[in-house]
């Protein structure tokens, strides 16, 4: 578990290499294959260069980046404004249960609210009960009768 002070900030170009290593850990945790570090580095660079498509917040302590959150804002007529979406949230295994995830979500919520978002959502794996409990503590609730659907483009 991390013991030094965590600082939350938006990712910068100088964070890309270290961030890609943490994203690799996420892919291993979720058993996603194959991991293409160069493609992920290019995507992170794109997000950093164009915050209008999304933002990446990082949690850093003296040991390095301990977690990240990727989010974006999209127009949503149902909610009557912008909808904030959390695309990814990952905290390094040895930094979990230390408040890192909560700090990342809080920072993203503040920034997205400042951008005009009126609601926030994310998908959580049905089997990931621990994550569901975490989000519930932060005030999130399952939307009854709805499920996330996907299609590759």
Give the residues covered by each predicted segment.
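Acetyl-CoA-dependent GNAT
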Residues: 6, 10-16, 21-81, 87, ...
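Conserved beta-strand-loop-alpha-helix junction that forms the acyl-donor binding cleft
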Residues: 121-131, 150-153
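Conserved active-site alpha-helix within GNAT-family acetyltransferase domains
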Residues: 102, 126-145
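Residue-level recognition of the GNAT/N-acetyltransferase active site
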Residues: 74, 92, 125
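Conserved acetyl-CoA-binding loop-helix of GNAT-fold acetyltransferases
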Residues: 91, 97-110, 133, 137
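Basic/polar N-terminal segments that are highly enriched at the extreme N-terminus
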Residues: 1-4
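Conserved GNAT acetyl-CoA-binding A-motif
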Residues: 105, 113-123
